[in-house]
Amino acid sequence: MSESWLVTGALGCIGASIVRTLVREDVRVTTFDIGDDDSRLRLIMEPAELERVTLVRGDVTSLEALGGALDDHEVTHVVHLAALLIPLARADPPLGSLVNVVGTTNIFEAVKQRRERIRGLAYASSAAVYDVVDDDAAEDEMAVGHPTTLYGVHKLANEGTARVYWVEDGLSSIGLRPYIVYGPGRDAGMTAGPTLAMAAAVRGDPYTIGWSSRSTFTYAPDAARAFVDAARAASEGAPVYNIPGETVPMSEVVAAIEAEVPGARIDYDDVPLPFPEEFATGGFPMPVTPLAQGVRDTVALFQSRV
């Protein structure tokens, strides 16, 4: 049976890159999002590529809607990304819990009900499951963190949901924890600053990144590749892995932008992020694009759209 993919949250940064990756592999792709703003898809895909994508407007808090999409498109693989990020989950905690926790539970339940057809499930957890006090935990991908944001609590709960579906129902999955993802389409969330700075530099505008921590930076197409590979992996259990990247201070990020856009007016606030600087990786093989190359490619795409 040929592959047919459902990607929830596909209109976001990582989701758009996943859709592009799959389309370029000549795979059938259906997106499932509550909104209809496909600007991130249009930013990174050619019109002919986008015509091959089926866009479905739906809400992950509806088990019926999810089941309908899975059946209508005979889905064989699922990547679940749909979520309210830190600022939105903080602004409306009940809605954040509904989307992030109940929505994810619905994904697992819908896939369980169709396990004879659906061969792979990957979902997004987050480095937000950790706190700065979790430096030791961050050295072990299977360690339990102590999140200090509602979003992080939601993601930690989802990792538990995945384990329970494995233990009680034998439903396999792989969770991946992104940290600082950058690249075209990354324009929302607490850590979008580096990409917003690249876009500002191309426009000739000044920009101040709102934090300064030494952090691990992952290029969005690398994260996309990791999710696709995870959904295809013939795994057993419910493992969770940290997505790798290049760990550098913010000064190196700014320098990489300035190298591509001489005269760029980029600075950053001396504010740390509430997460460890880097994390254990290696449990699941994933690509890592050097930061300088990722910034170069991102700036080039922004320049091509000016």
Regions found by a protein language model. Give the residues of each.
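N-terminal Rossmann/SDR dinucleotide-binding element
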Residues: 1-77
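Short alpha-helical oligomerization interface
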Residues: 87-103, 139-147
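A conserved pocket-lining segment of Rossmann-fold NAD(P)-dependent short-chain dehydrogenase/reductase
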Residues: 89-90, 173-184, 196-218, 222
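Conserved Rossmann-fold NAD(P)-dependent oxidoreductase catalytic core, especially the SDR/UDP-sugar
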Residues: 105-150
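Flexible, glycine-rich beta-alpha linker
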Residues: 130-131, 149, 174-192
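Active-site Tyr-X1-5-Lys
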Residues: 132-135, 146-174
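Glycine/proline-rich active-site loop of Rossmann-fold NAD(P)-dependent oxidoreductases
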Residues: 156, 169, 182-195, 220-221, ...
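C-terminal substrate-binding subdomain of Rossmann-fold SDR/epimerase-dehydratase oxidoreductases
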Residues: 205, 209-306
